[in-house]
């Protein structure tokens, strides 16, 4: 009995302790899952890639920068039973996924222009077809490109905006002509991602294999990451209570929420967000003019540490709750036009937006180094309560349709900006000493090459090599060229070189500086005509200026050939100047027409001929009509003839006025009628001149004239006024019949053949009077 008890006691004592230890080990809490949760990366946020592939996904690659446009790639997961038809706006890809609820989805690309499915592998960028993702189109070697951001003036907080691009600069692109094909090789490329956060991943992947970053390798951070110390700090924060965090945020907000600097920061952020809204052409840019952040602060609840990878990627989630009255006022102007008959009017438009409630689950992400920013976004669409108050010309509008439309646009803007997968970023540190933007870099290991520019000392050495200093004047340069020309066995001095012996004026070729600072050759000619021609054709000769990268690399052979070209141009201009100019652009009228010359010569001759004829006519009238026994003195006769001349000039002037008035009232008179009238008048004048030359006061011929028998009065009985009247009629070329029916002072032959030419009538085209349009009766 005792022996049995001893055995049972020994066996029970031996097994009891191991049994207790086994129960303890079985029931004790373990941290294995937590350790794995911290170390292993989150599979939801990282893409499962092959070992050799650094990154893959859809990107937009263009050869031109999309100025003022968003280049983001819109990719959506749509169930297979709801897929749209493929078109220019939608492209259904062959990539499929399965949602957590078991629904088969397929990727659809919105606006697939210039979109590729790309991978970065072994230092090369492979671009596949966006729909058939296994069809390779282009392969780009990243080692030949420089990876920077475009535009280069963008700030650190706006690097990964959808309107900015990752610029792949090909160094030799300026030396090669762009091909007409769609090939992307040897060209500058602009890369856009799906989201700003996705663009950062592509930037690091492209930068790691680019020409300017040979030291960066995958999963190698430029700054050492102390994982042990970070893990210790995280495990020390084991309390789930977040009151301290809310108190900390509230204290900071209490100190800055009423400062002008904080308001300016909020205004700048809101203005950039509102600038993404497309406005009509009649409206100007939207500006935020006032901000009121209120007194309440957002509270943080349910702060949860999600994961921390061994590469340094941190993910934290939290629930945000805000209840307050935050408002801001935006303003713009609209230029309204009322037609061409009324002036346009500028109407001020204002919009007051008040945020009273927002709540949702937020994700905070810090990517592995060298990332220097915090990415934040809502997991799902947050609950928002907005109050919109539109105002036009200081008058508030109460149209519900307009208010709902504006509210919907603002909610869509929030969803496109800070709802997954779209994330917004905030740089927590900016290193201005870093060679490039977009991260934290080790300057000692990372050296960006700089574009070498020709140093000033190299230019001075080049000038010394040419035998001239930097302060050489124009005269010394001319002497230097003269010296070079004499050394080249040229017989003519360089300052007086004549290329053509037939060219008479000697050209003085000198070097002068133009307004751009370059040296040009000028020719000072002794002939003033050629100077004028040269000044008129300065634009033609300016094209002949020799372009030199350095003003001291000027050779005599180039100057001699250029001087010959200048002389040939001057000779051509000289011969061209002597050619008759074309009139009205008609090649058939290269010279003055014969009609124009004839009219000019007739007008010139008729003036002097008229003076001589008038003098001879006065002498003949004195000898024929005026009796020697007349009581009229020579002075009286001359005064009478001067008075008659005045009357003749007045009559001619009146005829000219009548003719001009007639032409004024008949604007449709043809040019041929004017020419025929002038020809008839000229022929009548010529015939009258012949009559004056043949005038012969023969008394016997006058007596033999049968018409003279019927004359009852003699010539001596004629009054002086009648004789002057007849003389005036003969001078004007329109002789009329004598009161007794005879022609005065004409012989028988002239009286039988001569008939006065009547003045040709002017062809006047009468116009029908314009009849007034009857008014349109009102309906």
UniProtKB/Swiss-Prot annotation:
On the Lumenal side, which residues?
Answer: 24-779
Q: Which segments show compositional bias classed as Basic and acidic residues?
A: 454-465, 675-691
Read off the InterPro entries from this record: MMM1_dom (IPR019411), SMP_LBD (IPR031468)
Write down which residues bear the modification named Phosphoserine: 473
Q: How does it sit in the membrane?
A: Single-pass type II membrane protein
Q: Transmembrane ranges?
A: 3-23
The entry lists its GO molecular-function terms as:
lipid binding
Query: Compositionally biased, Polar residues: which spans?
Result: 484-494, 660-674, 733-750
Which stretches make up the SMP-LTD domain? 238-429
Q: What segment(s) does the record annotate as region Disordered?
A: 454-539, 573-592, 654-779
Which of UniProt's keywords are assigned here? Endoplasmic reticulum, Glycoprotein, Lipid transport, Lipid-binding, Membrane, Nucleus, Phosphoprotein, Signal-anchor, Transmembrane, Transmembrane helix, Transport
GO biological process terms, semicolon-separated: ER to Golgi ceramide transport; lipid transport; vacuole-ER tethering
Any one GO CC term of the record: endoplasmic reticulum
Domain of life of the source: Eukaryota
Q: Which residues lie on this side of the membrane: Cytoplasmic?
A: 1-2
Question: What are the annotated glycosylation sites?
Answer: 233, 489, 536, 640, 660
Indicate where this protein resides in the cell.
Answer: Endoplasmic reticulum membrane; Nucleus membrane
Q: Name one Pfam family in it.
A: MMM1
Show the domain comment.
Answer: The SMP-LTD domain is a barrel-like domain that can bind various types of glycerophospholipids in its interior and mediate their transfer between two adjacent bilayers.
* Function, in words: During endoplasmic reticulum (ER) stress or when cellular ceramide levels increase, induces contacts between the ER and medial-Golgi complex to facilitate non-vesicular transport of ceramides from the ER to the Golgi complex where they are converted to complex sphingolipids, preventing toxic ceramide accumulation.
Identification of the protein by name? Nucleus-vacuole junction protein 2
